[in-house]
Amino acid sequence: MPPSPAVVGRSLVNSFKQFVSKDLHTRHVDATYRLVLDCVAAVDPLMRLYTFGSTVVYGVHEKGSDVDFVVLNKTDVEDGKGGDAATQVAKGLQADILAKLARVIRQKHLSWNVEEVRRTRVPVVRVKGGGAVDFDITAYRRNGVRNSALLRAYFEQNPPCRWLSMSIKRWSKQTGLNASVIGGSITSYGFNLMVVYYLLQRNHLQFVPPSTIDVSRVEPLPPHLPLEEPADEGLELGTQVLDFLHFFLHEFDSDKQVISLNRPGITTKEELDWTKSAEDFARMNGEKVHYQWCIEDPYELNLNVGRNVTPLKRDFLRRHLEKARDTALLTIV
């Protein structure tokens, strides 16, 4: 017998005591942003620096968490609804500008540890010891800015729903489901899409067309969004958590349906041609793509954010969803 919503809520609120006692204001990010912006200007004064990721989505920053930055040129910003090029040429241009930026950062901040990572899907510069905040920098990619702005637009509609998202994100890392953990398969971004999709299906949020998000109208460093403690000793949070788990265990049909914010209502695998035959065809072309747990990216065409979920990992996910129901996302032993 699963615990009641009240018990789940109290347990989760208790588990976040240390988190809410911290200074979660984004002012810590502001200082680092200005230092990095100074380095960007030294490379190219016309370049813009944007923040994306959880700091933008939630409007808070926990000390010790990494921050994501991206450098964009004037054309990227003016064409704020344009798609990101995924060619090898584009990847090379990203790596080149990041190499220049990495050199400037090393010159201006001798104590910072700067690592250039080229052999990834997206080239990135990773910086540790960046003042109070560690950060990653990518280049010429608007999708991260648009994704984060879209998710923030949803959470601004109903700010307390951030607690559901943060609870699911933390649980996903504890269970090893999160791609940030070795063996994990769904990114924090993917779990955020799952949370917002669930909230839309329950009419807790109003649909936001992804096409309305324009980088030219997004603030490079969005302001802090105060985070109030869950009301009613977490009763609403406990209710949402149990219903989220029930939804993905018993209502969402992973064999036929796609988690999608691209359009209202239900999206099917058949509509997107995310079928077993498409999976087999991709494998014949050397691509490791799975359509077992489908999460459609709002901006990157034909991208399944859940592409790393194999049949085995889908079963693993379901077992953890069942266990989460009985343990209040592992907060009740």
Curated annotation (Swiss-Prot):
Effect of R121F: Loss of catalytic activity
SUPFAM superfamilies found in the cross-reference section: Nucleotidyltransferase, PAP/OAS1 substrate-binding domain
GO biological process, one term: RNA 3'-end processing
Binding positions (UTP): S54, S65, D66, V67, D68, G144, V145, R146, N147, S148, K169, K173, S188, Y189
UniProt cross-references to InterPro entries, sorted A to Z: MTPAP-like_central, NT_sf, PAP_assoc
Residues that hold RNA according to the record: R121
Consequence of changing D136A: Loss of catalytic activity. Does not affect UTP binding
Enzyme class, spelled out: transferase
Cofactors required: Mg(2+); Mn(2+)
GO CC terms: kinetoplast; mitochondrion
Site residues by UniProt (Important for catalytic activity): D136
Family the UniProt entry places it in: Belongs to the DNA polymerase type-B-like family.
Subunit field text: Monomer.
Name under which the protein is recorded: Terminal uridylyltransferase 4
